[in-house]
């Protein structure tokens, strides 16, 4: 899986160069996806178990089917959000700019990768700035709940404003952090952090996982 690829790549570079710089880590997130087989080998989406019930008298015209939805104050042509992508490295900028432009053209939403790099390396902010390429897109900012716990709301609000985001995704990723060399180990205070941001920020706050799903217990 992608976690294995990331761990293998990061562990090798950690051994060669010491702890990875935040920009190098972001580059290492791109490399496995471009060159390795990162899909699950055994797990599936379970869609193979879905059987659609055929309706013989639908009483509709196909051309009148409307997939558009309203999400976070903006209308999407379909309930699709390309998220969360990348940022923090010059190669990441091209990915963000290209996909954001596609999302803008097709009426989808677009989510940035973790903006932690912007805090640690302000010179990387441009890799997250996609409004020039996607002026109308529903744009979601991104920060990890662990990092947000240590940041004041004013700092996060400034990061959101700098990229012109319509909302903030607070990502939850303990599984990835546990297997990533140099990853976080303190996951306390997450619920309180999200509640604080919901109250303090001028934009909606969304909780999202990075790939392992949200259990019913966590959702409640």
Where are these regions (language model features)?
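An N-cap/entry alpha-helix motif that binds or orients negatively charged groups
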Residues: 5-72, 76
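Short, well-ordered coil/turn segments that N-cap beta-strands
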Residues: 77-80, 106-108, 135-139, 164-166, ...
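Active-site mouth loops of central-metabolism enzymes
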Residues: 83-93, 142-150, 208-213
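Active-site cofactor/substrate anionic-group-binding motifs, chiefly glycine-
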Residues: 72-117
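Hydrophobic faces of well-ordered beta-strands that scaffold small-molecule active sites
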Residues: 80-83, 110-112, 139-143, 170, ...
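Acidic (Asp/Glu)-rich catalytic clusters
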Residues: 100-105, 127-136, 157-164
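A gly/proline- and charged-residue-enriched helix-loop-helix capping module
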Residues: 108-144
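Alpha/beta enzyme core
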Residues: 147-220
